[in-house]
Structures are given as C-alpha cells and as structure tokens.
Design a protein with these regions (language model features):
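Proline-enriched interdomain boundary motifs that mark the N-terminal boundary
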Residues: 1-8
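Short, solvent-exposed loop/linker segments at the N-terminal edge
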Residues: 11-17
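Structural beta-strand segments of beta-rich domains
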Residues: 17-21, 82
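Extracellular Ig-like/FN3 beta-sandwich strand-entry sites
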Residues: 18, 54-58, 128
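Solvent-exposed segments in extracellular or luminal domains encompassing
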Residues: 41-58
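C-terminal edge beta-strand
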Residues: 70-78
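Feature for extracytoplasmic/surface-facing segments of secreted or surface-associated proteins
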Residues: 79-209
C-alpha cells in the first residue's frame, strides 16, 4: 500500500489568510485532493491554500499505487477577529479578554490582549463577553486600577465598543435584547435614542453629535 506524510502549517489561521500544505508519499504513482481543496496532485510537494471557513477546514490527499489506495486528512481551524475600543474616555493599557465562563476575569485559558494608546484592541473571536480590566483614562490620565467594564456579545461583528453603557446592558439585558424583566430595551431604560447602537457607538468619537 502507498504511505503518505501530510501536514499543514499553521494548523489554526485567521480566515482569508493562507496555510502551507506539505506532503510526500511512497509506493504511489498518482495523488488527488478533496475536501477543502481539489485537483490532481504530485506524489510529493507543497501548496499554499487559503482558509475560507470558520471552524474546521479539512484537506484530504488520496494516493494510489500498484498496491492499492491510501488517504490522509489534515484539519486547519479557521477563525475570525473582532476589533474594538475601550471607552470611558479612551482607556489605554487595559487588559481586554473574551470571558467565556462569565466570571468577569481574564483567565489564562481565554484570549486576551492589551488596549493600545488609542484604547483600541483586536482579539480572536469566540462566543462570550468582552471584559476590560484596569488601564489609564487618556482624558484624565487617571490610572483605573481594577476598573471593570464589559460587553455581552450576542454574535460576531467586526467592531465593538466596551463602555459603561454596555456594562449596564450586560447585567440588565438578555441575549434577545430585552432588559429588567419589562421587555424594554436598554436604550429605552437609559433614555438613549433608539437610533443609537450602544454596542458599536463610540461616544468619544461622536462627542457633540
């Protein structure tokens, strides 16, 4: 039977970016691809492929020889990133994470980063709540030791804000957007115009509006 050595580098990649597939075989005279790639392949080689899907992207290589057929599959996990900004005045140097277990801490197993000098951050997206801890208020230059604000995410979007208002919504509102048991939304409760999306609205960038 043919034998196949088949690998992907890296095995986890941001979608719309590339990975390198490498393979070699013995006792084979032809190979073909299936799954997340396709076509006839040489019995040994490398190929750069784009990761297009979130979750598992499976690549299968099947090789044939006089002794029969053999297949091998490698899987690459595709993921997305979410951008955002921490605002109560922009907050730099805050630890920002996606809290997956709802303990309002940035555990070592959770994806985390530090907000930059404009309060901005970028994180690998998973389901959970954005939590910002500490940092420095860029308006007042006050160090916000252990200051915590959050944003309960209900799905993927490319940009999110973490503000005191999103923190209130995290505690008062359900995932369907109703709050405090009354069926009202957070905008109504806080007297904010319903045209404002509190989860993406940057209050500093829109001062005076």
């Amino acid at each position: 039977l043919p034998s196949i050595s088949f690998s992907a580098d890296p095995t986890s990649q941001l979608i719309n970016n590339n990975v390198t597939l490498s393979w070699s075989s013995s006792n084979a005279n032809s190979c073909s691809a299936s799954g997340s790639w396709s076509g006839t392949k040489t019995t040994a080689g490398t190929e750069i492929v784009q990761i297009t899907g979130v979750g598992n992207n499976s690549f299968t290589l099947s090789c044939s020889g006089s002794g029969g057929n053999r297949s091998s599959t490698v899987t690459v996990e595709g993921y997305r990133e979410t951008d955002g900004v921490v605002v109560d005045g922009y907050i730099s140097g805050a630890e920002v994470c996606i809290d997956e277990n709802s303990n309002f801490l940035c555990d070592s197993s959770e994806f985390s980063t530090t907000s930059d000098n404009d309060g901005k951050f970028k994180l690998r997206y998973v389901d959970g709540s954005l939590v910002s801890i500490g940092g420095t208020d860029l308006d007042s230059q006050i160090i916000l030791e252990n200051y915590l604000i959050s944003h309960k995410m209900t799905g993927y979007t490319e940009f999110k804000v973490v503000t005191p208002v999103t923190s209130v919504a995290s505690f008062l509102c359900t995932n369907n957007g109703t709050c405090d048991g009354s069926g009202a939304n957070i905008n109504t409760i806080l007297g904010i115009d319903n045209s404002v999306d509190i989860y993406t609205f940057d209050p500093v960038a829109n001062r005076g509006d």
